[in-house]
């Protein structure tokens, strides 16, 4: 019996290409959700709307005018899966409500242990890691270095928009 490979996607950004492996065994709900948005072309033309050089880059839900795109239903938070918020991992973004993730995700640009599951209360539940950058971390590092400011009531917004041109499933 051969082990089925994890799905891989290619994210084309306005700053370069990032190849990402999805951990379908450890985060099946998050991966299925992410791939449903990928297959719908949902991420095409969205931006990285929150960039914090010493923390993470977040995208997957807003257009260049910071207007949120319509999302599907919220999913169960899989932060108890044992995966850690290490540099280069992707996790589902959410509100303070534990099971509120929809389309938005972030790439950890440093190890962020404080985002890992540490308890059952909302403030300690953590953020579900579901993927890992396998090529193109240099592109993510370039994104984290862009100049940011305040725009439309949001902080840490790139002054020049950084686009997700497309995300496509390759294997």
Question: Across the structure, where does each feature detected by a protein language model lie?
Answer:
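Cyclophilin-like peptidyl-prolyl cis-trans isomerases
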Residues: 1-171
